[in-house]
UniProtKB/Swiss-Prot annotation:
One of its GO terms (cellular component) is plasma membrane. SMART domains: EFG_C. GO terms for biological process: positive regulation of translation. It comes from Syntrophomonas wolfei subsp. wolfei (strain DSM 2245B / Goettingen). It is found in: Cell membrane. NCBIfam families: lepA, small_GTP. It catalyses: GTP + H2O = GDP + phosphate + H(+). Pfam families: EFG_C, GTP_EFTU, GTP_EFTU_D2, LepA_C. This is Elongation factor 4. Keywords: Cell membrane, GTP-binding, Hydrolase, Membrane, Nucleotide-binding, Protein biosynthesis. Its EC number is 3.6.5.n1.
Length: 599
């Protein structure tokens, strides 16, 4: 049985046809009928279909009768292709013995694909090269095969040319999986060891874990233990996904399936944890797993303060499905109660926000995203600051360190100059440049993470007409000249608009934000002063003129002293209003801090 199992995943850049190939494999092996066949079957979230990307991994079991007449079980463990989700990719790959590397015949290898292939090579997976979209007019399968050999060392004669859309050559892919990917090793008789590579919450069954059994076997009614927490549960149901949930009696070593054990809390089924038997435990857990650290932080606040509890509940549920989401309650003078959340990257942030709004019907406001800074104080202590409102006063700061990333940018060589210019603007330092082919280059730069956050990706695409691709990895902390810029309305600091900026860019950003706010904040009954300040030093100021009621409308001609009296009275009223009045800041003003870069 075990020798006929093949566990594999698909590595591909966004839009290189991974989900289409997965659909085609489901169809060919009979897992889906013609009627059920719909685009991106494994991407269950509406959002995934809309954006055309894979966010959550869904494992699926395919039964395939090979040309040698034997029946094989193929477990496809789908992986997301976006750089934010590289930890999910690593978990997926750890559950496999092989991977299909899918590359678009008209685009060639992209930067993120490279990063994921290296991850698969580190895990010793068998890699099968596939060139997809050979039916396109601009396809150059031979050039791409040559590139795969030069860059990754795959034998170009073994790379399979296919068109997932038309189904050409997909049968050969299934044969290659059977022939070239090794069956799982692992002793069926040993103590149970199963790897959790994903989990989600079911309102009826509680937390459900997707697992790959590495050793031993798991049966219904068994008592299991989570190795990280030591908690024990009784197994209510186990099964496989083919592609719908199907109960089975036993899952043994090498198999992929799901387990429901009545866990009420998703934190009990941690992604990357090892499940073992409670009565006969494995001596040590499976290696290679770490707690994911968020890289990008932002505040999420409900538009109605009464929605705070609903937001908490929604975040608790999302956390169930998303091990990398971090959040803690936060309070802002301007925005009321909300949460400070941590994400893997900007796409992750956008997806979480959209899911909260769609699936839980919440109206949310997100503050400008920021990274985590390491602040060394004059008394020798150290602070990790991820919220600008917690920034210490300048006189207490010795130096500030910010996170850096190593970015690999792949571009056609016509655009090398513009890319280097962009990286210099973003405070980058050049590392290396290498030619993959005569017209494709990989440029490596070291950049501050904060500079990548805003619109680096958009600028990259627009300067290279969409040809560049980007991959980045965390590369330690480094000292920078950073300061906190406060925005004040009538002398009061609006905490939600504060942000951290590099000294060289402070004046430019201050000027731009003050101008933008002047256009967005509606006129009040009294004059409003908008100021940008660093400590006590004002960098920029704009005034919004007061709305003025014509108090002289009733005076026809007549006595000037009467008019003066009315005008003085109005002036007094405005003065009093200014003392007690609060400026209403429209919600979209908080995103202006973000949009400045684009103007």
């Amino acid at each position: 049985m075990q020798k006929n199992i093949r566990n594999f995943s698909i590595i591909a850049h966004i839009d290189h046809g991974k989900s289409t190939l997965a659909d085609r494999l489901l169809h060919l092996t009979g897992a889906l009928s013609d009627r059920e066949m719909k685009e991106q079957f494994l991407d269950k979230m509406e959002l995934e279909r809309e954006k055309g990307i894979t966010i959550k991994l869904k494992p699926v079991r395919l039964n395939y009768r090979a040309r040698d007449g034997q029946e094989y079980i193929l477990n496809l463990i789908d992986t997301p292709g976006h750089v934010d989700f590289s930890y999910e990719v690593s978990r997926s790959l750890a559950a496999c013995e092989g991977a299909l590397l899918v590359v678009d015949a008209s685009q060639g290898i992209e930067a993120q694909t490279l990063a994921n292939v290296y991850m698969a090579m580190d895990l010793d997976l068998e890699i099968i090269g596939v060139v997809n979209k050979i039916d396109l007019p601009g396809a150059e399968p031979e050039v791409v095969k040559q590139e795969m050999e030069n860059v990754l060392g795959l034998d170009q004669d073994e790379v399979l040319p296919i068109s997932a859309k038309l189904g050409t050559g997909v049968e050969d892919v299934l044969e290659a999986i059977v022939e070239r990917i090794p069956p799982p090793s692992g002793d069926k008789e040993a103590a149970l060891k199963a790897l959790i590579f994903d989990s989600y919450f079911d309102p009826y069954k509680g937390a459900i874990s997707y697992i790959r059994v590495v050793e031993g076997e798991l049966r219904q009614g068994d008592m299991i233990r989570m190795m990280s927490s030591g908690k024990e549960y009784e197994v209510d149901e186990i099964g496989v996904l083919s592609p719908y949930m199907t109960e089975v009696e036993v899952l043994s070593s090498g198999e992929v399936g799901y387990v429901a054990a009545g866990m009420k809390n998703v934190n009990d089924t941690r992604v990357g944890d090892t499940i073992t038997g409670a009565r006969r435990a494995a001596p040590e857990a499976l290696s290679g797993y770490q707690e994911v650290k968020p890289m990008v932080y932002c505040g999420l606040y409900p538009l109605e303060n009464s929605e705070f509890e609903r937001l908490r509940d929604a975040l608790d549920r999302l956390k169930l499905n998303d091990a990398s989401l971090f959040y803690e309650p936060d309070n802002s003078d301007a925005l009321g109660f909300g949460f400070r959340c941590g994400f893997l990257g900007l796409l992750h942030l956008e997806i979480v926000k959209e899911r909260l709004e769609r699936e839980y019907d919440l109206s949310l406001l997100a503050t400008a995203p920021s990274v985590i800074y390491r602040v060394l104080l004059t008394d020798g202590s150290e602070l990790m600051v991820q919220n600008p409102t917690h920034w210490p006063p300048p006189q207490k700061i010795d130096r500030v360190m910010e996170p850096y990333v190593k970015a690999s940018i792949m571009v056609p060589n016509d655009y090398v100059g513009t890319i280097m210019e962009l990286c210099q603007e973003k405070r980058g330092s050049f590392i290396t440049m290498e030619y993959l082919t005569s017209h494709r280059v990989v440029i490596n730069y070291r950049l501050p993470l904060a500079e990548i956050l805003y619109d680096f990706f958009d600028a990259l695409k627009s300067r290279t007409r969409g040809y560049a691709s980007l991959d980045y990895e965390f590369h330690g902390f480094d000292t920078s000249d950073l300061i906190k810029l406060d925005i004040m309305l009538n002398g009061e600091v609006v905490d939600a608009l504060s942000f951290i900026v590099h000294e060289d860019k402070a004046y430019y950003r201050a000027r731009a934000i003050v101008n933008k706010l002047r256009k967005i904040i509606p006129r009040q009954m009294y004059e409003v002063a908008i100021q940008a300040a660093i400590g006590n030093r004002i960098l920029a100021r704009e005034n919004i003129k007061a709305m003025r009621k014509d108090v002289l409308a009733k005076c026809y001609g007549g006595d000037i002293t009467r008019k003066k009296k009315l005008l003085e009275k109005q002036k007094e009223g405005k003065k009093r209003m200014k003392q007690i009045g609060r400026v209403e800041v429209p919600k979209d003003a908080f995103m202006t801090v973000l949009d400045i870069e684009n103007d």
